[in-house]
């Protein structure tokens, strides 16, 4: 299924039904009087967060949603039928904006959450309502009230426990494919991942969490460069970030600074968001070169970076357990592996990871 995280749709609620002009006609009743019923109320337009959806792709094929008009009033004081509602079903995590793309209408963060987008129009009055002491036989009724119409924007922000961030070609998709059962596109060129991906990490017992692969960010992402705003929006809901840095590039410290600057420029709250930093692709360098890259990274990152390889699996489990601990899982029943020591003189890059 293709991933779509933004869509513009047109909505219109149903207009109210017209009131009826009718008079009572019955044998031996010469002056029956008015008995026209009111029109029915038009249908509303709702939006609802449902389970089982993780993309807005359905709105690529249907952009117009219209509720039904209310039924017209009838004689014998019969009110018209109410118009059927229109319900837009979206994934959890969808935000609704006005057409200006700045004014937020609602943020759907829970399954079953519903928001009224456009109420239906009221039904018109039948002539019975216009009867008075000076007008016993009114021939007047009201048309139904027109429904509301508007354009809105839908934006999906994935709800994941942890997010993978980094520059393009940092190995995020490879890590996701090794850590979960997800099958993202993997290739040896930048911007392979064009849409966010999700996978479920299962560490045994009840330790499970959702991991999101965020497409590569570039300098200026906070200002919208390279679809930066759309990608950063998915990071916004993650409780912890795993920052992958390609150790084969010339400046790992610069790569770290670039991503951190863009995150904090987009939202100051990212400064306090838990972060795990890992040097990836250590299988591509000798232990001596890995040590040198680690030294460069520590000039800007004061913590202890992990050493991992998505290809061989080295250090992957360490990173996953570090994420689980930040998420507050109880790991008492899980045999934790010995953490990788980034301060060792000769980091071991030759031992492949095994899930056993």
UniProtKB/Swiss-Prot annotation:
PANTHER family: DEVELOPMENTALLY REGULATED GTP-BINDING PROTEIN-RELATED (PTHR11702), MITOCHONDRIAL RIBOSOME-ASSOCIATED GTPASE 2 (PTHR11702:SF31). The keyword Cytoplasm applies. Keywords: Cytoplasm, GTP-binding, Hydrolase, Magnesium, Metal-binding, Nucleotide-binding. Its main location: cytoplasm. PROSITE patterns: G_OBG, GTP1_OBG, OBG. Residues 1-159 form the Obg domain. Belongs to the TRAFAC class OBG-HflX-like GTPase superfamily. OBG GTPase family. GTP binds at residues 166-173, 191-195, 213-216, 280-283, 309-311. One of its GO terms (cellular component) is cytoplasm. One of its GO terms (molecular function) is magnesium ion binding. The gene is obg. Monomer. It comes from the Bacteria. An essential GTPase which binds GTP, GDP and possibly (p)ppGpp with moderate affinity, with high nucleotide exchange rates and a fairly low GTP hydrolysis rate. Plays a role in control of the cell cycle, stress response, ribosome biogenesis and in those bacteria that undergo differentiation, in morphogenesis control. Pfam families: GTP1_OBG, MMR_HSR1. The lineage of its organism: Bacteria, Pseudomonadati, Pseudomonadota, Alphaproteobacteria, Hyphomonadales. InterPro entries: G_OBG, GTP-bd, GTP-bd_Obg/CgtA, GTP1-OBG_CS, GTP1_OBG_dom, GTP1_OBG_dom_sf, OBG_GTPase, P-loop_NTPase. Coiled coil: none annotated. This is GTPase Obg. It comes from Hyphomonas neptunium (strain ATCC 15444). GO terms for biological process: ribosome biogenesis. It is an enzyme of class 3 (hydrolase). Residues 333-356 are annotated as: Disordered. Residues 160-328 form the OBG-type G domain.
